[in-house]
Amino acid sequence: MANLRKTHPLLKIANDALVDLPAPSNISIWWNFGSLLGLCLAIQLLTGLFLAMHYTADIATAFSSVAHICRDVNFGWLIRNMHANGASFFFICIYLHIGRGLYYGSYMFKETWNVGVVLLLLVMMTAFVGYVLPWGQMSFWGATVITNLLSAVPYVGNTLVQWIWGGFSVDNATLTRFFAFHFLLPFVIAAATLLHLLFLHETGSNNPVGLNPNADKIPFHPYFTYKDLLGFIVLFLALASLALFSPNYLGDPDNFTPANPLVTPPHIKPEWYFLFAYAILRSIPNKLGGVLALLASILILMLVPILHTSKHRSLTFRPFSQIIFWTLVADVAILTWIGGMPVEDPYIIIGQIASALYFLIFLVFFPLSGWLENKLLGLS
């Protein structure tokens, strides 16, 4: 009798994705982040579901309902801390996953890559609306500042902003719809993740040398199930340590003050994982220009496969492109730092230079170095 996992219509899908999947034998630890993102999504869905059971999406009670969760609900403090810090780990994994894709040329799987960029946008949107829910000062003013950016849209801008607000300012209607979006979007993300995997399994995984690995493949289970399990343990230990020992380390102290439309916090800034994009937004002294740069900073990832000029797929054997890649990593770190700084003298110009460099690396330096390396290696 044939094995049930290979014949049952549902189990067969899981088997082909998690057990008998042929995987390149040489994929490194950098290939762990896909499954880690799946784990992050599962943690966020579970903790979020339990938080939603006790949270009230009303401006009169939202802040105190979060306090109630932390004080009175059994392990509510833990669920809330795991959820808030889980978002940070989600973004750490996403950025490492994207960095891996850029370094090893995984973007040559165009469908997988583009679904991935859409996933990034969905996760960013979910995190933004989620940050508004505790209804602290930074929640309120963050929502006000970021939704206000839509008023830069020509002709329909102001109407659009009022439509999203459900009134003439960020108010109860805004909070309730943001809660609805924050509940719904993770399920959309889960669906898009399946699409991401579907496209990936059409081609099979890339590998560190960027060559066709078909001659040397091994089953996903047991080799990579155990390798992923190690990653799960490390991620879970790190998340638990942060949530238990310093749960507020990455948060903003202003969010411990209930939202007050009459008092503006001295520095309005998003969570750390949006700071690089926020720095790019602020570096352009024009509202519409800033919004377009903000969008471009993410959507530029979709251009990467089109601008690939090298005959080599990965950067493993391309020293010039490696230097440019690590310059990009340093540049994003600088942008993250600048995004959290006040808008004053040295920071403004540093942010503008870093923003210009960010776009130049993608649009000019990567294609040029690929072309140059082809010439030097006689591959033209």
Swiss-Prot record:
Residues the record lists as binding heme b b566: H97, H196
Membrane-related topology note: Multi-pass membrane protein
UniProt remark on cofactor binding: Binds 2 heme b groups non-covalently.
InterPro entries: Cyt_b/b6_C, Cyt_b/b6_C_sf, Cyt_b/b6_N, Cytb/b6-like_sf, Cytochrome_b, Cytochrome_b_C_euk/bac, Cytochrome_b_N_euk/bac, Di-haem_cyt_TM
Record bears the keyword Membrane: yes
An annotated Gene Ontology molecular function: metal ion binding
Main location: mitochondrion
Required co-factors: heme b
GO BP term, pick one: mitochondrial electron transport, ubiquinol to cytochrome c
Regions that span the bilayer: 33-53, 77-98, 113-133, 178-198, 226-246, 288-308, 320-340, 347-367
Keyword Zinc-finger on entry: no
Binding positions (heme b b562): H83, H182
GO cellular component, one term: mitochondrial inner membrane
Annotated compartments: Mitochondrion inner membrane
CDD domains: cytochrome_b_C (cd00290), Cytochrome_b_N (cd00284)
Signal peptide (UniProt feature, chain positions): none
Top-rank lineage group of the source organism: Eukaryota
UniProt xrefs under PROSITE patterns: CYTB_CTER (PS51003), CYTB_NTER (PS51002)
List of residues binding a ubiquinone: H201
Keyword line: Electron transport, Heme, Iron, Membrane, Metal-binding, Mitochondrion, Mitochondrion inner membrane, Respiratory chain, Transmembrane, Transmembrane helix, Transport, Ubiquinone
Subunit composition and interactions: The cytochrome bc1 complex contains 3 respiratory subunits (MT-CYB, CYC1 and UQCRFS1), 2 core proteins (UQCRC1 and UQCRC2) and probably 6 low-molecular weight proteins.
Summary of the function given for this chain in its UniProt record: Component of the ubiquinol-cytochrome c reductase complex (complex III or cytochrome b-c1 complex) that is part of the mitochondrial respiratory chain. The b-c1 complex mediates electron transfer from ubiquinol to cytochrome c. Contributes to the generation of a proton gradient across the mitochondrial membrane that is then used for ATP synthesis.
Note: Heme 1 (or BL or b562) is low-potential and absorbs at about 562 nm, and heme 2 (or BH or b566) is high-potential and absorbs at about 566 nm.
Family: Belongs to the cytochrome b family.
Protein name per Swiss-Prot or TrEMBL: Cytochrome b
